[in-house]
Amino acid sequence: MTSPAVTSADITGLVGIVPTPSKPGSEAPDAVDTVDLDETARMVELIVASGVDVLLTNGTFGEVATLTYEELLAFNDTVIRTVANRIPVFCGASTLNTRDTIARSLALMGLGANGLFVGRPMWLPLDDEQLVSYYAAVCDAVPAAAVVVYDNTGVFKGKISSAAYAALAEIPQIVASKHLGVLSGSDAYASDLAAVKGRFPLLPTADNWLPSLEAFPGEVPAAWSGDVACGPEPVMALRRAIAEGLWDDARAVHEDIAWATEPLFPGGDISKFMPYSIQIDRAEFEAAGYIVPGPSRHPYGTAPAAYLEGGAEVGRRWAGIRQKYVATLAEP
């Protein structure tokens, strides 16, 4: 294994995760060529110009599960060309098996990606030995790639254990993991941080960045946000306040973000959100009005109306607080 050009030291600040805009009619099961590349370029330019530090593509709401191979490459080619080496780009390469993930990873790196955003096969859950072997195999096969691990309990049929994190920390190409951060009633973040021994950051959600940083000062250099697709200004204001040590300001932004995102989980229950997360997030992006996300792709096109309304309410609230932070960030 070799060390990639992008290292864990480069994963600081705000890591934006983007959706994959679709054309009208993309919800049809026989739709072809569904990616709106013009909207993709517009979205990426807006987000990069806002000052986001790192970009990830094709996670769950980025619809890595619904894009064809050709669509995935066309989308990421547009992202990479639009970013134009201004910030690191990690392209989503998750598939149902190791060989397809490696093939996809090689193609994405060939487009000019700085690294890969990689989840694990989930048809059957992987035990720790299989999980570590999988990531080691991908890194061995694509030695130029920096890798961000995708730790999503709902999608991958279980959380990555602290023991597995300790083994992953021995793979130099792994530069971060997309995590949730500090959670009430759980010591997983503390255990996982101890396991990786500072070799790469465990990225909390932006709405959990401040609590995670307060619990573990100096150990949380970055956080991730999909809400950048609703307008990055609130999370960029949080980033600035944290970077400048303005803790009262950071608390105020954190509270605004918590209020805006409160309706996302139906009844406050993430287990109800996860089966419909693509659709709910799509409703949020649509209501925020910052980008034109288009419809989600088949078969993830329907959800309970109340769940979609919760997502839309997040988008509306986000659009409201965004106006305040557009003005705040314009101040010297």
Swiss-Prot record:
Catalytic-site annotation from UniProt: K178
Activity under varying temperature: Optimum temperature is 45 degrees Celsius.
Activity-pH dependence: Optimum pH is 7.5.
Keyword Ion transport tagged: no
General function of this protein: Plays a role in phenanthrene catabolism. Catalyzes the transformation of trans-2'-carboxbenzalpyruvate to 2-formylbenzoate and pyruvate.
InterPro entries hit by this protein: Aldolase_TIM (IPR013785), DapA-like (IPR002220), HBPHA/CBPHA (IPR048038)
Keyword Lyase: yes
Domain of life of the organism encoding this protein: Bacteria
Group of enzyme by EC: lyase
GO molecular function terms noted in the UniProt entry: 4-(2-carboxyphenyl)-2-oxobut-3-enoate aldolase activity; 4-hydroxy-tetrahydrodipicolinate synthase activity
Activity regulation, per record: Not inhibited by sodium borohydride or sodium pyruvate. Unaffected by EDTA, EGTA, Mn(2+), Mg(2+) and Ca(2+).
Inducing or repressing factors: By phenanthrene.
Protein name as annotated: Trans-2'-carboxybenzalpyruvate hydratase-aldolase
Keyword entries, A-Z: Aromatic hydrocarbons catabolism, Lyase, Pyruvate
EC numbers for this chain: 4.1.2.34
UniProt cross-references to PANTHER family, sorted A to Z: 4-HYDROXY-2-OXOGLUTARATE ALDOLASE, MITOCHONDRIAL, DIHYDRODIPICOLINATE SYNTHASE
Intrachain disulfide bonds: none
